[in-house]
Amino acid sequence: MFGPPTPRQDAEYTAFVLSASSSLTRTAWLLTGDSDLAAELVQEALVKTYLAWRRVRHGEATAYARRILVNLNIDRWRRRPATPSEELDRAVLNGAEQAVDDRDEVARMLATLPQQQRRVIVLRYYNDLSEADVAGHLGISVGAVKSAASRGLATLRTQYTPVSGGGQ
């Protein structure tokens, strides 16, 4: 069960990476708000997935890698020294200096959420996971997922300002 992967397993892993990399990268970017850090987290998650490839169940590789990605982000956040909200400050400055497209606006809004709410919103609504799957990925109860999603969405609604010129 341990030892180097077989050529067949290498081929399966390569196919997995080709099919899952962009989704994992988008998830990491939404979790971090930083493309360089997102790429670093994805790379580390893919290495850990490769090392465990013999134990990964067929059909669950993306969920396995996503769980590693979320855990790496949690670990990074825990090890980060406490500093004022530099992500929020950076997003506010960027928003004041230039018009942002919808994707950047969503990222800015997500950056203002507490990490737990941000993780729940990204996994639940961006990755379209069920509440039970989100709970499993984050190691929390379904009730905690519902609560974090409700609070996170309420916060996002207060920040959202629709573009004028519509039919209202």
Residue ranges and their predicted role:
Residues 1-26, 36-39, 118:
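A short, charge-rich alpha-helical start-of-domain segment used by transcription regulators
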Residues 15, 105-113:
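Short amphipathic alpha-helical boundary/capping segments
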Residues 25, 35-52:
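Conserved RNAP core-binding helix
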Residues 43-47, 59-79, 149:
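Σ70-family region 2.3-2.4 aromatic/basic alpha-helix that recognizes the −10 promoter
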Residues 67-88, 99-102, 158:
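Arg/Lys-rich amphipathic alpha helix in sigma70-family domain 2
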Residues 70, 138-162:
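DNA-recognition helix of helix-turn-helix
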Residues 111, 115, 127-144:
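Helix-turn-helix DNA-binding module
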Residues 120-124:
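A short pre-motif secondary-structure segment
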